[in-house]
Amino acid sequence: MNKQSGMTLLEVLLAMSIFTAVALTLMSSMQGQRNAIERMRNETLALWIADNQLQSQDSFGEENTSSSGKELINGEEWNWRSDIHSSKDGTLLERTITVTLPSGQTTSLTRYQSIDNKSGQAQDD
């Protein structure tokens, strides 16, 4: 009698389980990479919004003031808030722009400006 060659049922099941484990691991890794790319995209857009606000609001204005607004990018609404405070030693004004991402996370960008002690006005360095 001729002996047939091939895989037994046990070998087929083992090969299928190994393939399934590898496929699930790859899918999980790809999902993690996709989430990381989305977070980096949102972080970059938030920093662009904050930088644009710092550039458009070139003068610092009064200390201990706040303002806020919204930007629409790619159909998503991004909220920003500008806060101006003086430093503890009174030589610098600090403007912080905080952008709230659509997911609820926040990103901040800060700019410092020296204060001219004679006039009390802020001046760029």
From Swiss-Prot:
Cleaved by prepilin peptidase. Methylated by prepilin peptidase at the amino group of the N-terminal methionine once the leader sequence is cleaved by prepilin peptidase. Keywords: Cell inner membrane, Cell membrane, Membrane, Methylation, Protein transport, Transmembrane, Transmembrane helix, Transport. It is found in: Cell inner membrane. One of its GO terms (biological process) is protein secretion by the type II secretion system. It comes from the Bacteria. Induction: Silenced by the DNA-binding protein H-NS under standard growth conditions. It is a single-pass membrane protein. SUPFAM superfamilies: Pili subunits. Residues 1-6 form a propeptide. The keyword Lipid biosynthesis does not apply. The modification N-methylmethionine is found at M7. InterPro entries: N_methyl_site (IPR012902), Pilin-like (IPR045584), T2SS_GspI_C (IPR003413), T2SS_protein-GspI (IPR010052). GO terms for cellular component: plasma membrane; type II protein secretion system complex. Type II secretion is composed of four main components: the outer membrane complex, the inner membrane complex, the cytoplasmic secretion ATPase and the periplasm-spanning pseudopilus. Interacts with core component GspG. Part of a cryptic operon that encodes proteins involved in type II secretion machinery in other organisms, but is not expressed in strain K12. Component of the type II secretion system required for the energy-dependent secretion of extracellular factors such as proteases and toxins from the periplasm. Part of the pseudopilus tip complex that is critical for the recognition and binding of secretion substrates. Belongs to the GSP I family. This is Putative type II secretion system protein I. It comes from Escherichia coli (strain K12). The lineage of its organism: Bacteria, Pseudomonadati, Pseudomonadota, Gammaproteobacteria, Enterobacterales. The gene is gspI.
